[in-house]
Swiss-Prot record:
HAMAP family: Adenylyl_sulf_kinase. ATP binds at G13, L14, S15, G16, A17, G18, K19, T20. InterPro entries: APS_kinase, P-loop_NTPase, Sulf_AdTrans/APS_kinase. Catalyzes the synthesis of activated sulfate. Residues 174-199 are annotated as: Disordered. The keyword Nucleotide-binding applies. Keywords: ATP-binding, Kinase, Nucleotide-binding, Phosphoprotein, Transferase. This is Probable adenylyl-sulfate kinase. The lineage of its organism: Bacteria, Pseudomonadati, Pseudomonadota, Gammaproteobacteria, Pseudomonadales. Pfam families: APS_kinase. GO terms for cellular component: cytoplasm. It catalyses: adenosine 5'-phosphosulfate + ATP = 3'-phosphoadenylyl sulfate + ADP + H(+). The active site is at S87. GO terms for biological process: hydrogen sulfide biosynthetic process; sulfate assimilation via adenylyl sulfate reduction; sulfate assimilation, phosphoadenylyl sulfate reduction by phosphoadenylyl-sulfate reductase (thioredoxin).
Amino acid sequence: MIEHPGFVLWFTGLSGAGKTTIAVALENQLRARGIRIERLDGDTVRQSLTKDLGFSKEDRDKNIERVTFVAKLLSRNNVAVLSSFISPYAATRDHVRGETTNFIEVFVDAPLETCIERDVKGMYKKAIAGEIPNFTGISDPYEAPANPDIHVKTHEQTLEESVQTIIRRSSHGWNRTNTFPLKSRPNPPHRHKSKSSRAGEPFISPVFVLSIIA
């Protein structure tokens, strides 16, 4: 396994925008090259860690709060974390940024109409009919990132193009003497170290981790 600083790629967007699809593709590329990585997904988490929560704003915030705790533990122990969650509220996403190591916000963008067309489970149809309350994009708001670190448009880009955009933009956003994205809002400085936490181990910049698969 390659030793590297932990980081969190946080995929946010409407249901059906392509968050999980992109995260899985990126995970496969990273894992095949020996990167220590874990993927956290909204559907999976709600079947286990947060199965007691609903979809009110309070419960949504609690959902992300628990996920943030897991991502925080993983990233500070040099694990790359791919997190795919609608996470509709800007303030909540900003909180995640402040709590985790080397946070990169990825806005997976697609028009609502496109997401509805992709909805094979018919969730949007049920939400429009009023059968599902608090459904993001229909009866509950989605606060799109005003200045995401990375912005992919899945209605215009192929899956491979989206993945390569993330790799390229992430690599451009890091340098070899810093451990957080240069173009994003920095995490609290005391949470990060510019060298490996283990004495004697070489420091490998996140730009290297992502650039080796470009």
